[in-house]
UniProtKB/Swiss-Prot annotation:
Lyase recorded as keyword: yes
Keywords from the UniProt entry: Amino-acid biosynthesis, Lyase, Metal-binding, Methionine biosynthesis, Zinc
Annotated metabolic or biological route of this protein: Amino-acid biosynthesis; L-methionine biosynthesis via salvage pathway; L-methionine from S-methyl-5-thio-alpha-D-ribose 1-phosphate: step 2/6
E.C. number(s) listed in UniProt: 4.2.1.109
Pfam families noted in UniProt: Aldolase_II
Cofactor(s) required for function per UniProt: Zn(2+)
Coiled-coil region list: none
InterPro entries per the UniProt record, alphabetical: Aldolase_II/adducin_N, Aldolase_II/adducin_N_sf, MethylthioRu-1-P_deHdtase_MtnB
Binding site for Zn(2+): H94, H96
Originating organism: Pectobacterium carotovorum subsp. carotovorum (strain PC1)
The UniProt record lists the keyword Metal-binding: yes
Species classification: Bacteria, Pseudomonadati, Pseudomonadota, Gammaproteobacteria, Enterobacterales
Protein name per Swiss-Prot or TrEMBL: Methylthioribulose-1-phosphate dehydratase
GO terms, molecular function: methylthioribulose 1-phosphate dehydratase activity; zinc ion binding
Amino acid sequence: MTENQQLTALLAACHWIGEKGWCPATGGNMSVRLDDAQCLITESGKDKGSLQAEDFLLVEIATNHVPSGRTPSAETGLHTLLYRREPTIGAVLHTHSVNATVLSRVEKGAELVLHGYEMQKSLAGQTTHLDRVAIPIFDNDQDIPALAQRVTEYASHTPLRYGFLVRGHGLYCWGATVKEARRHLEGLEFLFQCELQRRLLEAKA
């Protein structure tokens, strides 16, 4: 896929995310890998539902350097960390949905475990509802390098798959392509909504 095709796919994903209401008030950030050295990421403070091609900035994956001198998303370091750690990741989507934000606070443990849902099969490699899918949860931190270090420490002993939550903040998810990242995002959002509803109903029982 050419750079223009990748950007077109990411723009479409951003507009779809905006329509879903998963990135209100200019929140969130999205990126796509161009090659081993560079990615494109959303500029800071842009509404995701109305992004244009010029709202994406070229970033050097190894250093987070932005040749244009413009300001990328504050969380650029988490995107580039994922690209450095896993060469198969081709796109990263970070959203601020209500379900992901609330569930990340309701769950007090270090992981959100999803089990028994048919839609787990929307995640690459998952073939049955009987498996347990663990989504790590990291405490929020305005110090992005410190947060990235905690993600790195986790990934040193447990593979990062599909995505992770930042408590009270939102979801990071990814895929080999923008298309796969979109599917993972939609699948996880459905699963989060189911899990949140299940917990609410059980609490009332």
